[in-house]
Amino acid sequence: PMRHRLLIESRAIGPSPLCRLWPMQTTRTFPTMTVPTNSHREPPAPQLLRVATYNIHKGVQGLGPTRRLEIHNLGLAVEQMDADIVCLQEVRKMNRREAEYFRRWPDVPQADFLAPEGYRAVYQTNAFTRHGEHGNALLTRWPVITHQHEDMSDHRFEQRGLLHVEVMFQGRPVHAIVVHLGLIPGSRVRQIQQLQRFIEREIPPGAPLVVAGDFNDWGSQLKRMLASYGLYEFESQDASTLTYPARLPLAQLDHVYVRGLTPLGLHVPQGRVWWRMSDHLPLIAEFRF
């Protein structure tokens, strides 16, 4: 689909131009992070891997009759990230109620709709609901070797899962795992333990590994657990990496952890354009082999 401007749609007002996505409104940046403004997407410099993670809130913001369809804006946002790997959570495969409500609801699953030209979309459902299903997705401009899904549901009230995708990045295999952990602290601990067992079972010890997503963790317990498994992220010294809630971020719930790669920097886009699209802000990280 053509994406030439940001659009906003609600049931009441219909589609209208919002504003141009670029340049991003950013109040805080890292010197190592540059997001290009050119429209065509060339791969970054050799051996530099850019990974983004984004909880897209199922492509809809707001409640009741004032809710807005943001999936078109999110498509532009993903394109402008210019990432090698984009890890998405709360991605709808389909939803009959929303498709009937919004005139501009895409006629393809959200993962396919959000994938920029030349990218491959890999999706797996975590949750089945009355009107549809949603889960995790990974978008990449590099060849996909294999992919698999594992159920991580810890109790019957939350359906969770991990998506594992192996991509061939500049001739080297890189493993990426997309996660969306539970709301209960004990569940998250058990899910991290399950993640570790999955890594030990499915991923070669020396292979570069990325684990990204919405960890739903307001503290540092999971960070310590992941560090004990050899997974680390870029350590920021200020509040520039807070991602939730998008309008006034108080915590960094979204992370990109790696093994076998060197973290170089993080970037969290700021501003009204971004907090209107989802309840989370995206997080973009760069790594060096």
Where are the predicted features?
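Active-site beta-strand/loop signature of hydrolases that rely on acidic residues for catalysis
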Residues: 50-56, 74-102, 139, 175-179, ...
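N-terminal, active-site-proximal structural segment of metallo-dependent hydrolase catalytic domains
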Residues: 3-6, 11-116, 128-133, 193-194
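Solvent-exposed loop/turn segments connecting transmembrane beta-strands
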Residues: 130-131, 155-159, 185-187, 275-277
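Active-site environment of divalent metal-dependent phosphoester hydrolases
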Residues: 58-61, 93-96, 129-132, 184-187, ...
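Metal-dependent phosphoester-hydrolase catalytic domains
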Residues: 10, 24-39, 166-168, 197-209, ...
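Conserved beta strand-loop-helix elements of the APE1-like EEP
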Residues: 115-118, 131-146, 249-264, 287-288
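A short, structured active-site edge motif that brings together acidic residues
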Residues: 117-130, 148-153
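Beta-strand-turn-beta hairpins that frame and shape the catalytic cleft
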Residues: 42-51, 134-136, 140-146, 158-178, ...
